[in-house]
UniProtKB/Swiss-Prot annotation:
GO cellular component, one term: cytosol
Domain of life: Bacteria
Name of the protein this chain belongs to: Polyribonucleotide nucleotidyltransferase
Predominant location category: cytoplasm
InterPro entries referenced in this protein's UniProt entry, alphabetically: ExoRNase_PH_dom1, ExoRNase_PH_dom2, ExoRNase_PH_dom2_sf, KH_dom, KH_dom_type_1, KH_dom_type_1_sf, NA-bd_OB-fold, PNPase
E.C. no: 2.7.7.8
Compartments in which it is found: Cytoplasm
Family the UniProt entry places it in: Belongs to the polyribonucleotide nucleotidyltransferase family.
Limits of the S1 motif domain: 621-689
NCBIfam families: polynuc_phos, PRK11824.1
Keyword tags: Cytoplasm, Magnesium, Metal-binding, Nucleotidyltransferase, RNA-binding, Transferase
Biological function: Involved in mRNA degradation. Catalyzes the phosphorolysis of single-stranded polyribonucleotides processively in the 3'- to 5'-direction.
Keyword Ubl conjugation belongs to the record: no
Length: 707
């Protein structure tokens, strides 16, 4: 019934298996891939004809993790998987980025890739095997995919690169880098590092590229057995060269003139006018509108790229290494815990840091198990930032991806929870955008956290690099504009400190990027990063000495483990009362660590005093303040140490005979008592008569001194 094709190899110490022909046979391409005990199914399906009127490639990648893969039942009311998690969105982007440039020119059929995690061994992150399976599924599908690609994860520990480290090894590694590409070159890099030098980062990229070559060979071997006939791509219904020649004669000079305008809005208006002129004239001459739109993009790209290669001058008049003017401000929002406004040319980010307690941590339910995240960074890109009116809603894939990149860039500099027990949320509102808004977020995040009093050892900055390559000639561009990103060959984002790189993200549209070009780009990025850091330092070069006055003050105390239940109380009664009475937030951990947080210092002091009173043991001979809580014929019960009560016997009320307890004290009276000792049941025996009720002086010691 099944015609199964299978290929396998040992890779990075584990067996990689690719199989097709048994599952999802109605998809154009389907590959069942396993690595260790992690199993994914990747499918690729394409529409049989292109979408009419579409001038772009409609590709969708959906990566999904099934709870059953880790032997779990989903939480929530419905007990089934819901909207994509952040991990699923990020992995979908990770798969999409290296495959998108490899589809044939002119291919416009709607294409969907679905990757499903079916088994997770809790050792290998499924993202690498998902990328490999996707590459294999596309390669055998007949879809015009000019792959295959390979992918690998690279760690770095004790001066050695590690291929496909386990989840446990990644935690201990100085580097977590994912690289993907073809036999010829690297197409995509995503990484987080602990301030590593540029040569180590480049070495990791090239190490990964070498190590995934056998995977590409394995996919080719599978395709030789199982690949379907390639899909035919219809030839354009027009003569592209003729249309391009006519358009260049008609508006070529207008487009060149438009690209001399340094203000983005003016430039876009001029380009729009040139495009409209071409459309009206050439459609009237009989050219199809879609032909005009498609060729206009090529003409625009040729003019921009040729100008940079020939003159070394860019759209806004800068040289290839110049950084746009930078203005940094901190403390721009009076009630925020930390805030910064970072402006670089026409890109601007308003970044705000907020400090919270353990109760504000994000609870993440992942396949690997539930964990708590104490650092969050959220990136928002409203339509007004590019002068447009658009939809507002939940964050899209791009916003989630940009936020995660900035999160990776800053996280290696964060203090430990032991030294800074706060939950940190950073929000970046992009208020203007013309390229490199994610790197503006990195700069603004660093400034806002230092403004909030987060003790970062050094500021962090980021820069976006670009590349234009024509034949053997190339130009590496520092601090790219939006147009240079869209029309260039590379988007290369580097973030770090003066010591080294903390995050690196690379997307390359061509396969001929050499190691030498990447080396030049990294060196140029370092120079740019150092310049940006020097500009940021003019606003704030080190963290504030204390957290902002509007932020909660967290005080950490330790109590004996056997006293935790006393502080919490039956059903949480005691801790609720402390919180309600003092206004402080209280977190108690299993090891007896207690974190008390309050904006008002007095509230924090009151809560700490209360807790210490509960856990403190009364000492014989010590004098305490207390309150009469119960009257009996034989004496009065006094609450004197947190929730602890003791008995003042009627004979210990006064230095004279007392007929009735109520003659001396009444319920609710504030009194001063001395601990005499404990009875045989452990109950505390107290005395009032040996304490001066006005001054709190120990009268028994006074008598001894006088005697």
């Amino acid at each position: 019934m099944f015609k199964v094709f299978r290929k396998e190899m040992m890779w990075g110490g584990r067996k990689l298996v690719l199989e097709t022909g048994k599952v999802a046979r109605q998809a154009d391409g389907a590959v069942w891939a396993s690595y260790g005990d992690t199993v994914v199914l990747a499918t690729a399906v394409a529409a049989k004809a292109p979408k009419p009127g579409v001038d772009f490639f409609p590709l969708t990648v959906n990566y999904q993790e099934k709870a059953f893969a880790a032997g779990k039942i989903p939480g929530g009311f419905f007990k089934r998987e819901g909207r994509p998690t952040e991990k699923e969105v990020l992995t979908s982007r990770l798969i999409d980025r290296p495959i998108r440039p490899l589809f044939a020119d002119g291919y416009r059929n709607e294409t969907q890739v679905i990757v499903t995690v079916l088994s997770h061994d809790l050792e290998n992150d499924p993202d690498i095997v998902a990328m490999v399976a996707t590459s294999a599924a596309l390669t055998i599908s007949g879809i015009p995919f000019l792959g295959p690609i390979g992918a690998a994860r690279v760690g770095y520990k004790d001066g050695q690169f590690v291929l496909n480290p386990t989840l446990e090894q990644v935690e201990a590694s100085d580097l977590d880098l994912v690289v993907a590409g073809t036999t010829e070159g690297v197409l995509m890099v995503e990484s987080e590092a602990k301030e590593l030098p540029e040569d180590v980062m480049l070495g990791a990229v090239m190490f990964g590229h070498r190590e995934f070559q056998p995977v590409i060979d394995l996919i080719i071997d599978l395709a030789e057995m199982a690949a379907k006939d390639p899909m035919a791509i219809p030839a354009p219904a027009y003569d592209k060269d003729a249309v391009k020649t006519r358009m260049a004669a008609l508006i070529g000079q207008d487009v060149r003139q438009a690209y001399t305008l340094t203000v983005k809005q003016e430039r876009y208006a001029a380009i729009g006018a040139a495009k409209l002129k071409a459309l009206e004239t050439m459609v009237a001459e009989g050219t199809a509108p879609e032909a005009v739109a498609s060729v206009f993009k090529e003409l625009e790209s040729d003019i921009l790229r040729g100008s940079v290669i020939e003159t070394g001058k860019r759209i806004d008049g800068r040289t290839t290494v110049d950084i746009r003017p930078i203005v940094s401000q901190v403390g721009v929002l009076p009630r925020a815990h930390g805030s910064a406004l970072f402006t670089r040319g026409e890109t601007q980010a308003l970044v705000v840091a907020t400090l919270g307690t353990n109760q504000d941590e994000q609870i993440v339910d992942a396949l690997e198990g539930e964990y708590r995240e104490s650092f969050m960074l959220h990136y928002n890109f409203p339509p007004y930032s590019v002068g447009e009116a658009g939809r507002m809603g939940s964050p899209g894939r791009r916003e989630i991806g940009h936020g995660k990149l900035a999160w990776r860039a800053v996280r290696p500099l964060l203090p430990t929870k032991e030294t800074f027990p706060y939950t940190i949320r950073v929000v970046s509102e992009i208020t203007e955008s013309n390229g490199s808004s994610s790197m503006a977020t990195v700069c603004g995040s660093s400034l806002s956290m230092m403004d909030a009093g987060v003790p970062l050892p050094r500021p962090v900055a980021g820069i976006a690099m670009g590349l234009i390559k024509e034949g053997e000639k190339f130009a590496v561009l520092s601090d790219i504009l939006g147009d240079e990103d869209h029309l260039g060959d590379m988007d290369f984002k580097v973030a770090g400190t003066e010591k080294g790189v903390t995050a690196l993200q690379m997307d390359i549209k061509i396969t001929s990027i050499t190691e030498e070009i990447m080396k030049i780009a990294l060196a140029q990025a370092k120079d740019g990063r150092v310049h940006i850091l020097s500009e940021m330092n003019k606003a704030l070069n080190t963290a504030r000495e204390a957290v902002n006055q509007n932020a909660p003050r967290i005080t950490v105390i330790n109590i004996p483990k056997d006293k935790i239940r006393d502080v919490i109380g039956s059903g949480g009664k005691v801790i609720r009362e402390i919180v309600e009475q003092t206004g402080a937030k209280i977190d108690i951990e299993d090891d007896g660590t207690v974190k008390v947080a309050a904006v008002d210092g007095k509230a924090s002091e009151a809560a700490i005093k209360w807790i210490k009173g509960i856990v403190a043991e009364p000492e014989v001979g010590e004098i305490y303040e207390g309150k009469v809580v119960k009257i009996m014929d034989f004496g009065a019960f006094v609450n004197f140490l947190g929730s602890r009560d003791g008995l003042v016997h009627i004979s210990e009320l006064k230095n004279e005979r007392v007929a009735k307890v109520t003659d001396v004290v009444k319920q609710g009276d504030a009194v001063k008592v001395k601990v005499l000792g404990f009875d045989d049941r452990g109950k505390v025996k107290l005395s009032m008569k040996v304490v001066d009720q006005t001054t709190g002086e120990d009268l028994s010691k006074k008598e001894e001194a006088e005697g």
